[in-house]
């Protein structure tokens, strides 16, 4: 007897439905996308109990005639494409012709639709993939689809659904993302017979964001745009003070489609690097219009993931666009003081020496020297200029082209509108210091609090970055031997130029080992060896921006070690010098780790606390 059998059509449909219909939210997504593709201006979504017993999506799109209404439930029946050539220039959200057939295979579906100008509409009822009713009906132009009893005939799938409240959350997430993708469409969302929201459909994405996320996100938005012959970008990003523990507030849209893409995420991360704390993520609403032939959306059943034909170009455009906007906006966070509390109820956060002070080992003598030189700057010496820089090695050509985007942008800084912090803190009056850690200054109706370590760290970070091509190295007292795996040794030789740029000079030493002859001057021997090993590990990952990250991490660490610390007492001259240097930095608002350098408190806020004004 044969062991291999051809499956019947009913079983095939159920298997295929499993790829398209994971849960009720998948159904809502497919139906809304069909409505958008139909040219709808108004879409209504109604669900009950997480969409398991009932989903309804209605629209005022082009509608269908009787023949199309029946064909729509056939597998791979679509109006979006006609041949395989169309797959290379997809301009619609749907194109496979699987959605309705897959949905109908695992539920009870009722479709009512009418074309413009038709006297009557068409009603089609499908149960478990089989058409059980087809009649004429009276209905408005467009399409209305009701889906009942999801997975009624696949109990194994149904038992893996979450509770209704969780499934409702997934649906709300889908509707939210689709609202953001098409601000020109008015969406009405009703959950368990309660209206959740209505969007205006006026085409203004800021209005949609305000409606969905409230004023906190809306008021924090920075707008940036970029346009070339075949690429158009609009990015709305929250200021650095608005950040989250995950990427849930990052929305990427390419040609109207919500997508996930590592290149876009990497570009956002790199642009915000040093502006927000580590492992925190900004709010970003990114809209891209690009020639459909330059992307591939047909790589995943849900069409969530896409590929760009030129990932590097996309990274560069997104990175520069966001970075430009960060330079143009005032990023000083304003302290919000709750009016209900009086001064005796407000808890003042304390910072212990253990939390704030970086401890130095005996191998960090070079770092201590750099720090002490800060005190001598007022005698005519500039610590971080020629005396601390080696002449550029003639053997060093331009850094690996993975760094090109970052460095090209660094060279363009002068063309970007500089921050206005210099104006804000010019003619200030130094009030004093607090806890030997914070500097308090006053100007007009605002007083500012500056973290002295974060400020100096930012200054040094930008100085070291500008000197990166001439970074100082030193010969080690005792040669440092590093044992490597055979493939790692090959990688080290392949990336020798990059490692030289990072301050490491080495040569092969026996089997699967190298010997470090020179290391960055700012590092002690134990740190230099461990950092070299960490760098080799990261080089194994060929992500687009890793080499940029290696450069960043090295410089950030050096700046942190050399900066003045919390509990260091600074003289008035030193404070003035710190301010002069801070005013000319590219980003005076955060330290390289993304913590705030400066915060502002207004006179009005203080007067409200003391009830001078109500």
From Swiss-Prot:
Protein keywords: DNA damage, DNA repair
Domain of life: Bacteria
Biological process terms in GO annotation: mismatch repair
Claim: DNA repair is one of the keywords in the record: yes
InterPro entries found in the cross-reference section: DNA_mismatch_repair_CS, DNA_mismatch_repair_MutL, DNA_mismatch_S5_2-like, HATPase_C_sf, MutL/Mlh/PMS, MutL/Mlh/Pms-like, MutL_C, MutL_C_dimsub
Aminoacyl-tRNA synthetase recorded as keyword: no
Alphabetical list of SMART domains matching this protein: DNA_mis_repair, MutL_C
A GO term, aspect molecular function: ATP binding
Annotated Pfam families: DNA_mis_repair, HATPase_c_3, MutL_C
GO cellular component, one term: mismatch repair complex
Entry-linked CDD domains: HATPase_MutL-MLH-PMS-like (cd16926), MutL_Trans (cd00782)
Cross-referenced PROSITE patterns: DNA_MISMATCH_REPAIR_1
Entry function: This protein is involved in the repair of mismatches in DNA. It is required for dam-dependent methyl-directed DNA mismatch repair. May act as a 'molecular matchmaker', a protein that promotes the formation of a stable complex between two or more DNA-binding proteins in an ATP-dependent manner without itself being part of a final effector complex.
Family: Belongs to the DNA mismatch repair MutL/HexB family.
Name of the protein in question: DNA mismatch repair protein MutL
């Amino acid at each position: 007897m044969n062991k291999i059998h051809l499956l019947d059509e009913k079983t095939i449909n159920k298997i295929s439905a499993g790829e398209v219909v994971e849960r009720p939210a998948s159904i809502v997504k497919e139906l809304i996308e069909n409505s958008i593709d139909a040219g709808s201006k108004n879409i209504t979504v109604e669900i009950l109990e997480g969409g398991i017993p009932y989903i309804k999506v209605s629209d005022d799109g082009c509608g269908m005639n009787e023949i199309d209404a029946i064909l729509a439930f056939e597998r791979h029946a679509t109006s979006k494409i006609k041949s395989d050539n169309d797959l290379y220039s997809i301009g619609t959200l749907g194109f496979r012709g699987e959605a309705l057939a897959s949905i109908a295979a695992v539920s009870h579906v009722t479709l009512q639709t009418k074309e413009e100008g038709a006297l009557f509409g068409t009603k089609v009822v499908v149960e478990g993939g089989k058409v059980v009713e087809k009649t004429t009906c009276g209905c408005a132009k467009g399409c209305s689809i009701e889906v009942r009893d999801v997975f009624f005939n696949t109990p194994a799938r149904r038992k893996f659904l979450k509770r209704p409240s969780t499934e409702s959350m997934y649906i709300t997430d889908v509707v939210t993302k689709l609202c953001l993708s098409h601000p020109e469409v008015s969406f009405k969302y009703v959950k368990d017979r309660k209206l959740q929201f209505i969007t205006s459909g006026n085409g203004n994405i800021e209005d949609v964001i305000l409606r969905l996320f409230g004023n906190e996100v809306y008021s924090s938005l920075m707008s940036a745009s970029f346009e070339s012959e075949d690429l158009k970008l609009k990015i709305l990003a929250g200021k650095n003070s608005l950040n989250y523990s995950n990427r849930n507030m990052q929305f990427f849209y390419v040609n109207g489609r919500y997508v996930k893409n590592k290149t876009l995420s990497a570009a956002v991360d790199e642009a915000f690097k040093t502006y927000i704390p580590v492992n925190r993520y900004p709010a970003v609403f990114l809209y891209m219009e690009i020639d459909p032939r330059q992307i591939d959306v047909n790589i995943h059943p849900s069409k969530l993931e896409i590929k760009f034909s030129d990932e590097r170009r996309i990274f560069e455009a997104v990175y520069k666009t966001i970075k430009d906007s960060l330079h143009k906006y005032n990023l000083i966070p304003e302290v919000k003081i709750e009016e209900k509390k009086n001064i005796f109820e407000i808890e003042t956060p304390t910072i212990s020496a253990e939390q704030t002070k970086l401890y130095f080992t005996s191998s960090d003598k070079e770092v201590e020297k750099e720090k002490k030189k800060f005190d001598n700057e007022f005698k005519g010496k500039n610590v971080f200029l020629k005396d601390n820089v080696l002449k550029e090695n003639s053997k060093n050509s331009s850094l690996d082209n993975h760094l090109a985007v970052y460095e090209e942008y660094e060279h363009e800084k002068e063309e970007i509108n500089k921050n206005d912090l210099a104006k804000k803190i010019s003619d200030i009056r130094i009030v004093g210091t607090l806890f030997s850690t914070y500097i308090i200054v006053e100007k007009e109706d605002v007083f500012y609090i500056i973290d002295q370590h974060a400020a100096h760290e930012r200054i040094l970070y930008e100085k070291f970055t500008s000197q990166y091509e001439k970074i100082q190295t030193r010969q080690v007292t005792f040669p440092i031997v590093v044992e490597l795996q055979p493939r790692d040794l090959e990688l080290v030789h392949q990336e020798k130029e990059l490692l030289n740029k990072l301050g490491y000079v080495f040569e092969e030493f026996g089997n699967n080992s190298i010997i470090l002859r020179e290391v960055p001057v700012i590092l002690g021997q134990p740190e230099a060896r461990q950092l070299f090993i960490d760098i080799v590990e990261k080089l194994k990952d060929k992500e687009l921006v890793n080499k940029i990250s290696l450069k960043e991490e090295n410089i950030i660490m050096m700046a942190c070690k050399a900066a003045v610390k919390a509990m260091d007492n600074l003289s008035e001259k030193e404070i003035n010098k710190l301010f002069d240097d801070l005013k000319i930095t590219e980003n005076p608002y955060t330290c390289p780790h993304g913590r705030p350098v400066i915060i502002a408190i207004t006179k009005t806020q203080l007067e409200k606390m003391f009830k001078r004004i109500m």
